[in-house]
Protein backbone atom coordinates (compact mmCIF):
# COMPACT_ATOMS: atom_id res chain seq x y z
CA UNK A 1 0.00 0.00 0.00
CA UNK A 2 2.85 2.36 0.81
CA UNK A 3 5.05 1.45 -2.15
CA UNK A 4 3.95 4.28 -4.44
CA UNK A 5 3.95 6.89 -1.68
CA UNK A 6 7.49 5.96 -0.61
CA UNK A 7 8.61 6.00 -4.23
CA UNK A 8 7.12 9.45 -4.83
CA UNK A 9 8.57 10.85 -1.60
CA UNK A 10 12.00 9.61 -2.64
CA UNK A 11 11.48 11.19 -6.05
CA UNK A 12 10.70 14.61 -4.63
CA UNK A 13 13.23 14.70 -1.85
CA UNK A 14 16.21 13.48 -3.81
CA UNK A 15 15.48 14.65 -7.35
CA UNK A 16 16.21 18.31 -6.76
CA UNK A 17 17.75 18.77 -10.24
CA UNK A 18 14.24 18.44 -11.69
CA UNK A 19 13.08 21.39 -9.58
CA UNK A 20 16.11 23.38 -10.65
CA UNK A 21 15.31 22.56 -14.29
CA UNK A 22 11.68 23.59 -13.80
CA UNK A 23 12.67 26.87 -12.19
CA UNK A 24 15.07 27.59 -15.03
CA UNK A 25 12.66 26.97 -17.91
CA UNK A 26 9.45 28.37 -16.41
CA UNK A 27 8.51 31.86 -15.45
CA UNK A 28 7.64 32.45 -11.79
CA UNK A 29 3.88 32.77 -12.38
CA UNK A 30 3.70 29.47 -14.24
CA UNK A 31 5.70 27.71 -11.54
CA UNK A 32 3.48 29.25 -8.85
CA UNK A 33 0.33 28.08 -10.64
CA UNK A 34 1.70 24.53 -10.82
CA UNK A 35 2.55 24.47 -7.11
CA UNK A 36 -0.73 26.04 -5.99
CA UNK A 37 -2.89 23.83 -8.23
CA UNK A 38 -1.14 20.68 -7.01
CA UNK A 39 -1.29 21.55 -3.33
CA UNK A 40 -4.87 22.83 -3.35
CA UNK A 41 -6.22 19.92 -5.41
CA UNK A 42 -4.34 17.37 -3.33
CA UNK A 43 -5.52 18.74 0.01
CA UNK A 44 -9.12 19.63 -0.87
CA UNK A 45 -10.21 16.75 -3.16
CA UNK A 46 -11.27 14.41 -0.35
CA UNK A 47 -12.28 17.00 2.24
CA UNK A 48 -15.86 18.38 2.29
CA UNK A 49 -14.69 21.85 1.27
CA UNK A 50 -14.78 21.85 -2.59
CA UNK A 51 -11.57 21.59 -4.59
CA UNK A 52 -13.05 23.37 -7.64
CA UNK A 53 -14.30 26.25 -5.49
CA UNK A 54 -10.86 26.75 -3.96
CA UNK A 55 -9.13 26.64 -7.35
CA UNK A 56 -11.51 29.21 -8.82
CA UNK A 57 -11.16 31.47 -5.79
CA UNK A 58 -7.36 31.28 -5.95
CA UNK A 59 -7.57 31.98 -9.68
CA UNK A 60 -9.44 35.19 -8.87
CA UNK A 61 -7.02 36.05 -6.07
CA UNK A 62 -3.93 35.76 -8.28
CA UNK A 63 -5.71 37.22 -11.33
CA UNK A 64 -4.88 34.22 -13.46
CA UNK A 65 -6.84 34.33 -16.70
CA UNK A 66 -8.20 30.80 -16.46
CA UNK A 67 -7.67 27.42 -14.87
CA UNK A 68 -5.20 25.35 -16.87
CA UNK A 69 -7.17 22.25 -17.96
CA UNK A 70 -4.00 20.21 -18.43
CA UNK A 71 -2.92 20.86 -14.84
CA UNK A 72 -6.39 19.96 -13.56
CA UNK A 73 -6.31 16.61 -15.37
CA UNK A 74 -2.83 15.87 -13.99
CA UNK A 75 -3.93 16.86 -10.48
CA UNK A 76 -7.01 14.62 -10.72
CA UNK A 77 -4.84 11.71 -11.81
CA UNK A 78 -2.58 12.34 -8.84
CA UNK A 79 -5.48 12.27 -6.37
CA UNK A 80 -6.90 9.17 -8.09
CA UNK A 81 -3.60 7.33 -7.60
CA UNK A 82 -3.48 8.55 -4.00
CA UNK A 83 -6.87 7.15 -2.99
CA UNK A 84 -6.33 3.84 -4.81
CA UNK A 85 -2.88 3.47 -3.24
CA UNK A 86 -4.10 4.33 0.27
CA UNK A 87 -7.06 1.94 0.02
CA UNK A 88 -5.27 -0.60 -2.16
CA UNK A 89 -6.42 -3.64 -0.18
CA UNK A 90 -10.02 -2.38 -0.22
CA UNK A 91 -9.79 -1.56 -3.93
CA UNK A 92 -8.66 -5.10 -4.70
CA UNK A 93 -11.61 -6.51 -2.76
CA UNK A 94 -14.32 -4.18 -4.03
CA UNK A 95 -13.22 -3.27 -7.56
CA UNK A 96 -11.31 -6.40 -8.63
CA UNK A 97 -12.57 -9.39 -6.64
CA UNK A 98 -16.11 -8.05 -6.18
CA UNK A 99 -17.08 -8.03 -9.88
CA UNK A 100 -15.79 -11.61 -10.28
CA UNK A 101 -18.54 -12.83 -7.95
CA UNK A 102 -21.23 -11.90 -10.46
CA UNK A 103 -21.25 -15.52 -11.68
CA UNK A 104 -20.92 -16.98 -8.19
CA UNK A 105 -23.92 -18.38 -6.33
CA UNK A 106 -22.63 -17.08 -3.01
CA UNK A 107 -22.28 -13.31 -2.91
CA UNK A 108 -20.03 -11.68 -0.30
CA UNK A 109 -19.76 -8.14 1.06
CA UNK A 110 -17.15 -7.40 -1.62
CA UNK A 111 -19.69 -7.94 -4.40
CA UNK A 112 -22.47 -6.09 -2.58
CA UNK A 113 -20.33 -3.00 -1.99
CA UNK A 114 -19.07 -3.06 -5.59
CA UNK A 115 -22.67 -3.21 -6.78
CA UNK A 116 -23.69 -0.31 -4.53
CA UNK A 117 -20.74 1.79 -5.68
CA UNK A 118 -21.84 1.03 -9.24
CA UNK A 119 -25.41 2.15 -8.45
CA UNK A 120 -24.10 5.35 -6.83
CA UNK A 121 -21.98 6.14 -9.89
CA UNK A 122 -24.74 5.77 -12.50
CA UNK A 123 -26.48 9.17 -12.00
CA UNK A 124 -23.35 11.35 -12.29
CA UNK A 125 -21.95 9.29 -15.20
CA UNK A 126 -25.17 9.75 -17.17
CA UNK A 127 -25.56 13.41 -16.26
CA UNK A 128 -21.87 14.21 -16.82
CA UNK A 129 -21.86 12.46 -20.21
CA UNK A 130 -25.03 14.37 -21.15
CA UNK A 131 -23.37 17.72 -20.37
CA UNK A 132 -20.24 16.70 -22.28
CA UNK A 133 -22.14 15.37 -25.31
CA UNK A 134 -24.27 18.48 -25.68
CA UNK A 135 -21.30 20.73 -24.83
CA UNK A 136 -23.11 22.37 -21.93
CA UNK A 137 -20.57 24.38 -19.97
CA UNK A 138 -20.55 24.47 -16.20
CA UNK A 139 -21.50 27.75 -14.59
CA UNK A 140 -18.37 29.10 -12.92
CA UNK A 141 -19.85 32.36 -11.66
CA UNK A 142 -18.03 33.42 -8.51
CA UNK A 143 -21.21 34.39 -6.67
CA UNK A 144 -22.75 30.99 -7.40
CA UNK A 145 -19.65 29.24 -6.04
CA UNK A 146 -19.74 31.22 -2.79
CA UNK A 147 -23.48 30.75 -2.31
CA UNK A 148 -23.38 27.02 -3.07
CA UNK A 149 -20.51 26.64 -0.59
CA UNK A 150 -22.67 28.19 2.15
CA UNK A 151 -25.80 26.19 1.25
CA UNK A 152 -24.05 22.82 1.06
CA UNK A 153 -22.09 23.58 4.24
CA UNK A 154 -25.37 24.09 6.11
CA UNK A 155 -26.72 20.82 4.68
CA UNK A 156 -23.60 19.04 5.96
CA UNK A 157 -24.08 20.67 9.37
CA UNK A 158 -27.68 19.44 9.71
CA UNK A 159 -26.88 15.98 8.36
CA UNK A 160 -24.12 15.60 10.95
CA UNK A 161 -26.73 15.94 13.71
CA UNK A 162 -28.41 12.75 12.51
CA UNK A 163 -28.26 9.55 14.54
CA UNK A 164 -25.57 7.19 13.32
CA UNK A 165 -26.24 3.47 13.40
CA UNK A 166 -25.42 2.25 9.91
CA UNK A 167 -22.12 0.84 8.69
CA UNK A 168 -21.06 -0.02 5.15
CA UNK A 169 -22.38 -3.57 5.42
CA UNK A 170 -25.84 -2.05 6.05
CA UNK A 171 -25.95 -0.11 2.78
CA UNK A 172 -28.88 -0.89 0.50
CA UNK A 173 -29.69 -0.22 -3.15
CA UNK A 174 -31.92 2.65 -2.02
CA UNK A 175 -29.10 4.19 0.06
CA UNK A 176 -26.53 3.93 -2.73
CA UNK A 177 -28.88 5.40 -5.32
CA UNK A 178 -29.80 8.36 -3.07
CA UNK A 179 -26.09 9.06 -2.52
CA UNK A 180 -25.64 8.85 -6.30
CA UNK A 181 -28.42 11.39 -6.87
CA UNK A 182 -26.80 13.72 -4.34
CA UNK A 183 -23.48 13.34 -6.16
CA UNK A 184 -25.00 15.05 -9.22
CA UNK A 185 -24.92 18.29 -7.20
CA UNK A 186 -21.12 17.94 -7.21
CA UNK A 187 -21.26 19.31 -10.77
CA UNK A 188 -22.12 22.69 -9.21
CA UNK A 189 -18.78 24.45 -8.50
CA UNK A 190 -18.43 25.09 -4.78
CA UNK A 191 -20.67 22.24 -3.69
CA UNK A 192 -17.87 19.69 -3.06
CA UNK A 193 -18.21 16.14 -4.37
CA UNK A 194 -16.93 14.69 -1.12
CA UNK A 195 -19.21 17.03 0.83
CA UNK A 196 -22.46 16.11 -0.94
CA UNK A 197 -21.71 12.37 -0.72
CA UNK A 198 -20.89 12.60 2.98
CA UNK A 199 -24.00 14.74 3.56
CA UNK A 200 -26.23 12.17 1.87
CA UNK A 201 -24.65 9.29 3.80
CA UNK A 202 -25.04 11.14 7.11
CA UNK A 203 -28.70 11.93 6.38
CA UNK A 204 -29.16 8.20 5.73
CA UNK A 205 -27.71 7.38 9.14
CA UNK A 206 -24.17 6.21 8.35
CA UNK A 207 -21.45 7.03 10.87
CA UNK A 208 -18.79 9.60 9.95
CA UNK A 209 -15.96 7.20 9.14
CA UNK A 210 -18.18 5.02 6.93
CA UNK A 211 -19.64 8.09 5.20
CA UNK A 212 -16.15 9.41 4.42
CA UNK A 213 -14.82 6.04 3.29
CA UNK A 214 -17.78 5.49 0.97
CA UNK A 215 -17.24 8.97 -0.46
CA UNK A 216 -13.58 8.15 -1.08
CA UNK A 217 -14.37 4.80 -2.69
CA UNK A 218 -16.96 6.57 -4.84
CA UNK A 219 -14.37 9.12 -5.92
CA UNK A 220 -12.50 6.43 -7.87
CA UNK A 221 -15.11 5.97 -10.65
CA UNK A 222 -16.11 9.66 -10.43
CA UNK A 223 -12.56 11.02 -10.86
CA UNK A 224 -11.75 8.36 -13.46
CA UNK A 225 -14.78 9.36 -15.53
CA UNK A 226 -14.13 13.09 -15.25
CA UNK A 227 -10.45 12.67 -16.11
CA UNK A 228 -11.31 10.43 -19.07
CA UNK A 229 -13.65 13.08 -20.50
CA UNK A 230 -11.11 15.90 -20.03
CA UNK A 231 -8.19 13.84 -21.29
CA UNK A 232 -9.36 13.98 -24.90
CA UNK A 233 -9.36 17.77 -24.74
CA UNK A 234 -5.61 17.87 -24.09
CA UNK A 235 -4.27 14.69 -25.75
CA UNK A 236 -3.38 16.53 -28.97
CA UNK A 237 -1.06 18.90 -27.13
CA UNK A 238 2.56 17.84 -27.55
CA UNK A 239 5.12 19.90 -25.68
CA UNK A 240 8.19 19.04 -23.62
CA UNK A 241 7.43 21.84 -21.19
CA UNK A 242 3.82 20.68 -20.89
CA UNK A 243 4.85 17.18 -19.86
CA UNK A 244 7.23 18.53 -17.21
CA UNK A 245 4.27 20.42 -15.78
CA UNK A 246 1.99 17.37 -15.95
CA UNK A 247 4.48 15.08 -14.20
CA UNK A 248 5.18 17.65 -11.49
CA UNK A 249 1.50 18.31 -10.78
CA UNK A 250 0.76 14.59 -10.75
CA UNK A 251 3.42 13.77 -8.16
CA UNK A 252 2.69 16.76 -5.94
CA UNK A 253 -1.07 16.24 -5.89
CA UNK A 254 -0.49 12.54 -5.17
CA UNK A 255 1.63 13.31 -2.11
CA UNK A 256 -0.67 15.95 -0.65
CA UNK A 257 -3.81 13.87 -1.32
CA UNK A 258 -2.30 10.74 0.23
CA UNK A 259 -1.32 12.44 3.47
CA UNK A 260 -4.61 14.37 3.59
CA UNK A 261 -6.59 11.12 3.44
CA UNK A 262 -4.54 9.65 6.28
CA UNK A 263 -4.83 12.79 8.42
CA UNK A 264 -8.56 13.26 7.72
CA UNK A 265 -9.53 9.72 8.77
CA UNK A 266 -7.55 10.03 12.01
CA UNK A 267 -9.00 13.48 12.72
CA UNK A 268 -12.60 12.28 12.32
CA UNK A 269 -12.19 9.98 15.31
CA UNK A 270 -11.84 13.10 17.47
CA UNK A 271 -14.04 15.78 15.88
CA UNK A 272 -17.25 16.23 13.88
CA UNK A 273 -17.74 18.16 10.62
CA UNK A 274 -18.40 21.54 12.28
CA UNK A 275 -14.84 22.73 11.64
CA UNK A 276 -15.23 22.20 7.89
CA UNK A 277 -18.68 23.83 7.91
CA UNK A 278 -17.36 26.96 9.64
CA UNK A 279 -14.27 27.07 7.43
CA UNK A 280 -16.30 26.89 4.20
CA UNK A 281 -18.74 29.57 5.31
CA UNK A 282 -15.92 31.92 6.34
CA UNK A 283 -14.09 31.36 3.04
CA UNK A 284 -17.33 31.96 1.10
CA UNK A 285 -18.02 35.20 3.00
CA UNK A 286 -14.43 36.36 2.45
CA UNK A 287 -14.81 35.52 -1.25
CA UNK A 288 -18.03 37.58 -1.50
CA UNK A 289 -16.39 40.54 0.25
CA UNK A 290 -13.35 40.23 -2.03
CA UNK A 291 -15.59 40.28 -5.12
CA UNK A 292 -17.32 43.43 -3.88
CA UNK A 293 -14.15 45.41 -3.18
CA UNK A 294 -11.80 44.08 -5.85
Where are the model-predicted features located?
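Multi-pass membrane proteins that catalyze or facilitate reactions on polyprenyl-/lipid-phosphate substrates
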Residues: 3-294
Amino acid sequence: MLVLSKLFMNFYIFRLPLWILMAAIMDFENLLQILVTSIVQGITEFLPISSSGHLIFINELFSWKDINLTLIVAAHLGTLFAVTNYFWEDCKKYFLLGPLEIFSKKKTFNFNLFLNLFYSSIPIIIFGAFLKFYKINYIYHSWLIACSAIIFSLLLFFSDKNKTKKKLNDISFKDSFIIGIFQIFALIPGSSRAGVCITAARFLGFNRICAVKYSMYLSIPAISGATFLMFFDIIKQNSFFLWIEVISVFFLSFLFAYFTISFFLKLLKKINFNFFVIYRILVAIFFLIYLDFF
